[in-house]
Amino acid sequence: MMSGQELAEVVQIAVEDLHSDHHPVELENHEVTEEDLSPTLKRQRIEINCQDPSIKSFLFSINQTICLRLDSIESKLQVLEATCKSLEEKLDLIMNKQPNPIQVPMVAGSPLGATQTWNKVRCVVPQTTVILNNERQSTSVTKLEAHEESINRTTETLENMLNSAVPGRRHNTIVVKVPAPEDSHNDDDNDSGSEASDTLSNCGNSSSNMGNNVTLITLNSEEDYPNGTWLGDEHNAEMRVRCPITAADMLHISTNCRTAEKMALTLLDYLFHREIQAVSNLSGQGKHGKKQLDPLMIYGIRCHLFNKFRITESDWYRIKQSIDSKCRTAWRRKQRGQSLTVKSFSRRTPSSSSYTTTEGVQNTVSSSSDLQQTSPQALHYALANAQQVQIHQIGEDGQVQVGHLHIAQVPQGEQVQITQDSEGNLQIHQVHVGQDGQVLQGAQLIAVASADPTTGVVDGSPLQANDIQVQYVQLAPVAESSATAQAVEPLQTALQPEMHIEHGAIQIQ
């Protein structure tokens, strides 16, 4: 028989078996305490006890590389942030910058004041923009709508200015943008610098607020010089200029000029007489009050050199310096009273007209058919009222006396022309010109002068040693006392030893 203790153990075991598959019953208000929760299993701690130094150094190098890479990324981000700020400042500057006003277009007229016409040079190309000098290119930014609107406003301003300046103009104008004039170099005469050589002078009606870095050039067409040739690429309407140089002369230039600089200086002599070079330069600036060489012809020379020799902007800069130097040389020869005649032109093919310049204006002087029949015309000069020609008179003792041949008063509808034939002889004519610029009557020969007394012939009589020698045209105003109202009377004789006229219309001082 079991004892009481054994019976209690059997009952306890039976009770545990009955409740082994059932969860303990929890009352509704029962609170779970920490004691009721079963303890969580702890993760076994694994200790890594590695004493290998190579692994430690490898891990250290990886850590160091990652840190350096992060520092590099941080520095690049700082540089990028600074660049963004700089671009924002430049963009704000561009958006707030007011566009420079455009200069008025140039008009044609006589450089010596004889004929003041207002006919613009004809052009056959559409409106486009031509960059003469490559400007420094800044960092390109995205085009914004506001910037495009400012460009449109500038274009509208240009159109309005052109319409107001030249009524009835053709819509075929080349907009030439050139850099603003900078400080010129210190040279012998301090007349011009190549930095400002491409800057085109104001022509026509200009206002005080106009900028100096933009002007207009109207290209001409083939019908302006039917017997002439093209400077530049004749197949590119934007890179060509029609000039009065004949095909034979152009072939001669292309054959003999092996370098770009020599061709530029040769074309300069064909397009501008030495007398014009002496009183002009590329910029039209300087202490001597020089005029500007015709920008249209200078642009034609540039196009010709770029087409023939594929020159660069640095080459063109050097060539411009040579052109300015050539003009200064002619000016010094003029001051010393030396001859300005180009010897190589004595036997070249004469042309019917030539380019001269005053403030970048084209001049083409018409000549009569009678004048063309008497002698071939190579160069034309026209004198108006209050103009004079400086001459050298060679006396019997061989001494040279400097004087001035004054045109005291030219009657209305008349003008005086100085022409030079292919032999280098200078002839002074009086012509009658109508209001439309056409020659009404044949030109009357007033005087003939030559650098070589043996070559000049007047009505079969050679020039004598005491005859005058016309050196160059001087664009200096005549005193009002000498500008009388008397008309220039034609001379019956072609040349007089003393060039004395009774009425004082033409006199030597």
Curated annotation (Swiss-Prot):
Recall the GO molecular function terms of this protein's record: DNA binding
Could you tell me where this protein is found in the cell? Nucleus
Q: What is this protein called?
A: Protein BANP
Instruction: List, for all copies, the residue spans of the domain called BEN.
Output: 238-334
Gene Ontology annotations for the cellular component aspect, listed alphabetically = nucleus
- Please give the InterPro entries that the UniProt record associates with this protein: BANP, BEN_domain
Return the similarity comment: Belongs to the BANP/SMAR1 family.
**Composition bias, Low complexity:** 347-358
A GO biological process held by the record: negative regulation of protein catabolic process
Q: Show the PANTHER family listed in the entry.
A: BTG3-ASSOCIATED NUCLEAR PROTEIN BANP, PROTEIN BANP
Point out the gene that encodes the protein: banp
Pfam families in the record: BEN
Question: Where along the sequence do coiled-coil regions lie?
Answer: 68-98
Sequence segments annotated as region (Disordered): 178-207, 339-370
What UniProt keywords are attached to this protein's entry?
Cell cycle, Chromatin regulator, Coiled coil, DNA-binding, Nucleus, Repressor, Transcription, Transcription regulation
Briefly state the protein's biological role.
Answer: DNA-binding protein which may repress cyclin D1 transcription by recruiting HDAC1 to its promoter, thereby diminishing H3K9ac, H3S10ph and H4K8ac levels. Promotes TP53 activation, which causes cell cycle arrest.
Please list the residue ranges that the record marks as compositionally biased, kind Polar residues: 359-370
